Amino acid sequence: MTAQEVRLCGLLLQEHFGDVVENVGTHLIRNGVLTLRALAHETKLALDLVKKSLCVLVQHGMCTFGPGRRGPAGPVEYHINCEHILHMLRYPRYIYTAKSLYGDTGELIVEEILQRGQMTMSSTVKTVADRLTHNMPEGQSMDYNEVVSAFSRLVETHFLQRCPPMASAESSGTGSAETPPAVTQPSNPESHPDCYKLPYISLSGHGKRRRSSEDGEADQRAAKKAKTDSSECGDEGIHWQVNFERFHLHFRDQAIISAVSCKLDQTSGEIVRTMLRMSEVTTSANAAFTQALSANEIFRALPSNYNIARPILDQYLTLLVDDPMEFVGKAGDSGGGMFVVNLHRALANLARATLESVVQERFGSRSARIFRLLLRKRHLEQKQVEDFAMIPAKEAKEMLYTLLSENLVQLQEIPKTPDHAPSRTFYLYAVNQLPTARLLLQHCYKTVGNLIERRLYETKENKRLLEKSQRIEAILASLQATGAEATQLTEVEEMITAPERQQLESLRHHINKLDSGENQVDETIFLLESYINSTQASR
């Protein structure tokens, strides 16, 4: 873990769970595997607080545990999962994807499970149905069966998966009271055979509408009833979590489709979308290529609203194969031709375009021209860079040294003689894409950390004004629910003065820009992480 990743993990833990969980989490990140006693001693926190913090982290899949160095008889040791902590950056994106694919019901299902880490199916269905009913007009309610249907579709498409069961020693009677049973946590949920098997639940009815006076107590009652509800419905002990890997595959596919559509046209993007959809079940997460598909299969699987004749499809496939970006490759000639989507090559090209864009934005179009030239030609001397890029010697020298100082370009010395004399040495400039992508990834982590810190600072500085605004909004909602007159509502609204209202609008505008910036930088982070992981897997 780099310093920027540790800092970002700490900020995310603090924002979502508070200072105590952030203290425990960052201590585990810095010190690796620790026992409960060691963690409480080193953080100087009460043992009860450390236990609760670990429960929160385990509940959200950010901490794993298992037998320690002394074996099953020794104390349990805890290990933090930094990758899952960083996934919190993408929570808005996961929720938006669920909404775009499965509507408001899918959105609320994913939101509830992300908020609580893991939930039973019956508890999720009831909570989501209640929330949807609360937003419906009087006299309408959400049927549980509709929520169950949306939940089932999310499981069938692997966006939700069962939490792996705890593997513990069966017998409490065989061991002594002083020796607790060994408990281990499976690292891979998909190793469990029932990972995507839906339980049969006896659940019928409609969502209940909450009144404004009940809102404060609703969450407490829901937490107390969760176990009772799940045991009554028949899914006690079967908890579900969000499958981040499946969402990431969807994001990767969408990035590839978008790139093809921008480079060629919408029809080409739809053909690639069809190929990715057909092979998403048969292609592993780290595969460099999708499974080979024949032109006949692709033609039959195209959406009916795309009236593409077979000869036109063959022309599009030929165009995709011949394109320099190499998103699609040809793997054979049977069945009208066998085609694959080159996933690794697509991610490499997307990462390369990102690097070029960053260089252009920071250093200008001429520096970007030099950067692209080095990416294409591999190794060049300074004189060759000047000639190929058609840039004056002085400017080219300054730009190369600027890129070199930022570690975006590397300099390699190749001596002609053993004495390494400068006059008898070749100095070659080059761009190594993988280390450069790693460097940019660290810059992105730092940028997101800065954005979060700035947002927290803005919120803290205007805490009084935000609390006042929330109180007034609550009063207005209560008055509207009781059918108050317009004059009463106007009086309450005037409790916020014009300067305060202007300051509040400005604050919300800044917060929205910071949130938008976080999401945009996270898209770059995801692209670079996918490229780095794909490159490592292909070696």
From Swiss-Prot:
Molecular functions (GO terms): single-stranded DNA binding
Region annotation Disordered: where it falls in the sequence: 165-234
Composition skew (Basic and acidic residues), residue ranges: 212-230
Low complexity composition bias: residue spans: 167-179
GO cellular component: RNA polymerase III complex
Pfam families in the record: HTH_9, POLR3C_WHD, RNA_pol_Rpc82, RPC3_helical
Complexes and interactors: Component of the RNA polymerase III (Pol III) complex consisting of 17 subunits.
Designated name of the protein: DNA-directed RNA polymerase III subunit RPC3
Family, similarity comment: Belongs to the eukaryotic RPC3/POLR3C RNA polymerase subunit family.
